[in-house]
């Protein structure tokens, strides 16, 4: 079932006449793991911002369950439908990892962090004292326990070693296939792309289905 879609999306910056994204159309289904790839400057970050309701298209519609999100509240779309895993992690820096995770699900436990490889002694430490890779684990754990049906992730394995990155990819796939979430990952990682159900490529502002994953 389609949960998120792009319909004839065009996007340009206010001070430019050139479209960064040109007539994008895509449908994303619940229970699937998507990878979005492309060279630097291809528009991947803008693409993700539009899906998240952080920005609005110049022309076209972004729809959740068939409804144009512009007809409602962008903030409600982000709060109720989306959980973000961005490169700046979006963590509350004065809280601990466990407190951050419980912001989206009060029933979350330390086990949600332990299974992502965060050491137990770090769970009650201020997140500012964690490394980039450790903060990345917290952000992913928060997304996984969220009740939001869609996870949007920007390079979620970027600060992780190869072994941990592989585990994270498996967990994201599980979130899609077993929990029914729609997981969309912007990535440069061949590992993530290969593991995905579907690979979409952004090139010169155009979106095309590059290939299926596993």
Language-model segment annotations:
Residues 69-83:
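ABC ATPase NBD coupling module
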Residues 151-154:
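Catalytic Walker B motif of ABC-type/P-loop ATPase nucleotide-binding domains
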Residues 126-130, 134-136:
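Conserved ABC ATPase signature
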Residues 140:
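Hydrophobic anchor residue at the start of the ABC signature
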Residues 60-68:
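Conserved ABC transporter NBD signature motif
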Residues 52:
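Helix-to-loop junction immediately C-terminal to a conserved catalytic motif
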Residues 112, 116-128:
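Conserved ABC nucleotide-binding domain
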């Amino acid at each position: 079932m389609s949960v998120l879609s792009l319909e004839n999306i065009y996007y340009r910056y206010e001070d430019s006449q050139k479209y960064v994204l040109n007539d994008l159309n895509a449908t994303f289904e619940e229970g699937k793991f998507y990878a979005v790839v492309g060279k630097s400057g291809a528009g991947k970050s803008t693409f993700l911002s539009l899906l998240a309701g952080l920005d609005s298209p110049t022309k076209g519609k972004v729809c959740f369950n068939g409804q144009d999100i512009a007809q409602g509240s962008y903030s409600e779309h982000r709060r109720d439908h989306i959980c973000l895993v961005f490169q700046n992690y979006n963590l509350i820096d004065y809280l601990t990892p466990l407190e951050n995770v419980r912001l989206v699900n009060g029933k979350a436990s330390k086990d949600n962090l332990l299974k992502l490889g965060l050491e137990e002694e770090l769970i009650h430490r201020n997140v500012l004292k964690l490394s980039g890779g450790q903060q990345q684990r917290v952000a992913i754990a928060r997304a996984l326990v969220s009740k939001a049906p869609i996870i949007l992730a920007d390079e979620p394995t970027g600060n992780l070693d190869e072994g941990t990155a592989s585990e994270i990819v498996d967990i994201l796939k599980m979130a899609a296939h077993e929990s029914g979430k729609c997981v969309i990952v912007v990535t440069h990682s061949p590992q993530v792309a290969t593991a995905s159900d579907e690979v979409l490529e952004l090139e010169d502002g155009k979106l095309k289905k590059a290939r299926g994953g596993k």
